[in-house]
Each structure stands twice: as C-alpha cells, then as structure tokens.
C-alpha cells in the first residue's frame, strides 16, 4: 500500500471516529434532556390537577398500609374541619379538628372516653404527597415516569430515587406509595400504602359536625 493511501485511510478513520464521538456526545446530552422535558410536562400536569382539587376544600379518602397493625384510616375534610376515623381490627378511634374553633377532640367510642384539646395544626388540608416547588424540581430531574393502572385507575408511576409514587391522571391525587422494606416473620416485603376511595364535593356540614359527647367521660385539656 502506498504511503498516500495509508494517509488517506488514517484520515478517513479519524473522520469516522469524530462522527462516532459526536453521535455519542449528542446522545449523552439529548436523551437526558428529552427525559427531563417529558418529566417536566408530566409533573406540571399532576401539579395543575392537584391545585384544582385542593381548591375544592371538600374531599375524603381512605389510607391503608400493608403493616402488621392492620390499620385503616378514613380522612374527611371540608372547609377547615378535618376528621379521622381510625380502625384497628375491633378498636376504633375518631379524631375531629376544627380551624374555626381551634379545637381537637379524640373519641374512643368503645370505651366512651373523649379528650378535648387545643388544635394547633397547620391551617391547610394536609393532602399527602402534594408536589411542592422543591419536590417538583427533584422529580423532574431524577425520576423515571411511566404509566400504570392501580385498582383500575390510570396513574403516573413516578420512581424518584427509590420512592415510588402513583398519581391519578384525572385528579393528581396520590393513589399508592412504596417506600423501603419491612421484615415480617422473617420475610422482607415492600412497604406499601394505598390511598383509596377519593371523593370530592360530597361532604355536607352535617357529616363534619362536632362529635356528640353525651354519655362520654370527657377530659378537657383545652
């Protein structure tokens, strides 16, 4: 092979390697950028739905975790009044909170006991897993987002650094959360919490009335 041919071949190889390097560099830059853009669009969509739902100020839902305690909590919220109905096998407890009276009442129906105390809770609806500004930035940059059905509902599955969240596409509300693991009877399983039966604008003032403590032994710490 002539010296000129060798030079030509080497030059051709250099051009090829430059093209390959440019393609790889472009892929390294473009693919993550596209991912961030897609993530941003989805997260913004969830946030818009959440804000619309929060503005309703009238909702209820049920929380159930796969824990050994077998606790189910029903949460009701309307115009500054919040009520929890906590069920643990045969034991029930009701917690009622009012922003207007700054009052919190804990009721144990089976024991006919109640405690009244001052409510210093934050004046918000406290919906779980709402996406704030800082969380939004993290999710957009570091999440893997796919679509998945949970209990028949279309959801966005957001895997953010090991914390996996499923958000309803229609309401933006959290439907399911998976975070860490637990060991039960020597078996390691994922810690899963489900947020079910979301309902909006169905609660009435009667539903959220202060508990009737007639016949209860009441401890007043207000």
Give the positions of each predicted feature:
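N-terminal leader/targeting segments and the immediate start of mature chains
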Residues: 3-81, 204-222
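A generic structural signal for ordered secondary structure
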Residues: 58, 144-145, 155
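Gly/Pro-enriched, hydrophobic low-complexity segments
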Residues: 65, 84-94, 105, 148-214
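An acidic-aromatic
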Residues: 70-129, 175-176, 180-191
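Tryptophan-centered short beta-strand motifs
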Residues: 114-116, 155, 216
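Short acidic, Pro/Gly- and aromatic-enriched capping/linker segments at domain boundaries
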Residues: 131-149
